[in-house]
């Protein structure tokens, strides 16, 4: 049997972190076993679905490196791959259910259904449809239609049946049909519901494994009933755990960004995010945390997927991403940082090429401390601003030292005499100043650092002086002396 998995998002918003994790697990499982991964768009929610959302989801998947073998935009033998383009296909199978006695028209209004729901709740019972329209006569149906009622189609759930979901992550999970009640499979506008469409699509697209979030587990018995009624073979189900925040509540905006493109725009690398997403519920067969897509494809299995909730830990994501930043070549990293230099107004877009080597030196001096690339905007302002503001309390304390003025004058005079500021020449310069003034270590370097950057911490002072260059160093010292005096 060929392994065929799918990711079937509703285009009603952005690609959520949970959705991205589901897509990744499906992709990895298919690739691990030489199968096919399919992307299907479930746009049956006409009010909330949009082409814009679909584009955002597709862009996010492609950015992550999750490519599909069949589906929207790439085609395939079992299309179309949007639910709204498959309505005629669904209608055929609704007719089959009517013929077999598994479907009926329901004319209940929203108000009637809500009243029934409240009555069951008041009795401490689980809300479900009690089958009021199950056995309507043709006359009753006609009367309802004359009143202007538009019917839904409901699935007739057999009574007293135990439904077992054989789950590859959770083991066997049992449900009772009496707790489910007859459920809607076609809405009053003629569009099928998710629970019906997903069965038809998964069957016709020959999906072998349905890997999805735990929140879909309660839908599965309904889907199994439809599979059985139509005589379809069941796929294998695997329901992966929920993603919770560190406080063990459902992940939401208060736990940080929840959409993939928010992380992309902040400058998280796709390699870092993929690595982190894989660890939300799956554990590698060896003791390691940093790996690439190739490793994941070779090692992913559902046996190593936990049924316990996955905890979204932003500190762990930052650590993993920082390790992937360090794995990039300096050229690659610089190229990736250019949009943030432009965004901060440090350079114009058309200057990036001519200033590339200089920008590379800047990136080299700060990249080791980065968790994500947009942080670079705040780390590199010291290279672009000659009018240095001294606002840190720690920096102001340094300026109270008695020898600051004399030391800065000596430093300025030495810089003026230098032809080029290479790392070797700058190190030699500091040795000369130390010999001449007697100051060394913190007493030598800290006042110069504060005068040039306004800060007490940052990249190596030698790197700062080389990158800023003689002309700008002198401008900074002039500005500093005016401010200091």
Swiss-Prot record:
One biological process term in Gene Ontology: glutamyl-tRNA aminoacylation
- Return the motif ranges for 'KMSKS' region: 250-254
| Keyword Manganese set for record | no
Name the NCBIfam families on file: gltX_bact
Q: What is its main location?
A: cytoplasm
Taken from the UniProt entry, a GO cellular component term is: cytosol
Q: Does the keyword Cytoplasm apply?
A: yes
Subunit info here reads: Monomer.
**Gene3D superfamilies under this entry?**
1.10.10.350, Glutamate-tRNA synthetase, class I, anticodon-binding domain 1, HUPs
**Source organism of this protein record:** Caldicellulosiruptor saccharolyticus (strain ATCC 43494 / DSM 8903 / Tp8T 6331)
Main function: Catalyzes the attachment of glutamate to tRNA(Glu) in a two-step reaction: glutamate is first activated by ATP to form Glu-AMP and then transferred to the acceptor end of tRNA(Glu).
Which Gene Ontology molecular function entries are recorded, alphabetically?
A: ATP binding; glutamate-tRNA ligase activity; tRNA binding; zinc ion binding
Name recorded for this polypeptide? Glutamate--tRNA ligase 1
Give its E.C. classification number: 6.1.1.17
What does the UniProt keyword field contain? Aminoacyl-tRNA synthetase, ATP-binding, Cytoplasm, Ligase, Nucleotide-binding, Protein biosynthesis
Catalyses which reaction(s)? tRNA(Glu) + L-glutamate + ATP = L-glutamyl-tRNA(Glu) + AMP + diphosphate
Family classification = Belongs to the class-I aminoacyl-tRNA synthetase family. Glutamate--tRNA ligase type 1 subfamily.
Q: What class of enzyme is it?
A: ligase
The short motif 'HIGH' region is annotated over 9-19
């Amino acid at each position: 049997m060929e392994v065929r998995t799918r990711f079937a998002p509703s285009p009603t918003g952005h690609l959520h972190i949970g959705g991205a994790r589901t897509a990744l697990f499906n992709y990895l499982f298919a690739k691990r076993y030489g199968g096919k991964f399919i992307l299907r768009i479930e746009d049956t929610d006409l009010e909330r679905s949009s082409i814009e959302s679909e584009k955002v989801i597709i862009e996010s998947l492609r950015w992550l490196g999750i490519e599909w073998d069949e589906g929207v935009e790439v085609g395939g033998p079992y299309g179309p791959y949007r639910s709204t383009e498959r309505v005629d296909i669904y209608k055929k199978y609704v007719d089959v259910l009517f013929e077999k006695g598994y479907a009926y028209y329901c004319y209940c209004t929203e108000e009637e259904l809500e009243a029934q729901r409240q009555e069951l709740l008041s009795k401490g019972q689980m809300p479900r449809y009690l089958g009021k329209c199950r056995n309507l006569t043709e006359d009753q149906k006609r009367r309802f239609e004359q009143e202007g009622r538009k019917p839904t189609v409901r699935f007739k759930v057999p009574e007293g049946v135990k439904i077992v979901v054989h789950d590859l992550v959770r083991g066997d999970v049992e449900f009772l049909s009496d707790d489910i009640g007859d459920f809607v499979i076609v809405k009053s506008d003629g569009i099928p519901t998710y629970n019906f469409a997903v069965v038809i699509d998964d069957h016709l697209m020959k999906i072998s494994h349905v890997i999805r979030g735990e929140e879909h587990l309660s839908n599965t018995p309904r889907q199994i009933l439809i599979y059985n009624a139509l005589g379809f073979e069941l796929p294998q189900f695997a329901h992966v755990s929920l993603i919770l925040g560190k406080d063990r509540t459902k992940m939401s905006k208060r736990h940080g960004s929840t959409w993939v493109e928010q992380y992309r725009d902040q400058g998280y690398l796709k390699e870092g995010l993929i690595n982190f997403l894989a660890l939300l519920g799956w554990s590698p067969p060896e003791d390691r945390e940093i790996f690439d897509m190739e490793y994941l494809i070779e090692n992913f299995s559902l046996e190593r997927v936990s049924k316990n909730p996955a905890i979204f830990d932003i500190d762990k994501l930052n650590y993993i991403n920082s390790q992937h930043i360090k794995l990039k070549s300096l050229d690659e990293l610089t190229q990736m940082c250019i949009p943030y230099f432009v965004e901060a107004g440090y350079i114009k877009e058309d200057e990036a090429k001519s200033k590339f080597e200089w920008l590379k030196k800047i990136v080299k001096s700060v990249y080791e401390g980065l968790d994500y690339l947009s942080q670079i905007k705040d780390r590199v302002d010291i290279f672009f601003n000659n009018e240095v503001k001294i606002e840190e309390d720690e920096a102001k304390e340094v300026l109270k030292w008695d020898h600051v003025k004399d030391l800065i004058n000596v430093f300025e005079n030495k810089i003026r005499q230098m032809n080029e500021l290479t790392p070797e020449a700058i190190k030699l310069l500091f040795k000369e100043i130390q010999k001449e003034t007697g100051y060394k270590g913190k007493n030598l370097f800290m006042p110069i650092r504060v005068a040039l950057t306004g800060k007490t911490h940052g990249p190596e002072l030698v790197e700062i002086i080389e990158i800023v260059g003689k002309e700008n160093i002198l401008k900074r010292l002039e500005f500093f002396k005016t401010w200091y005096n």
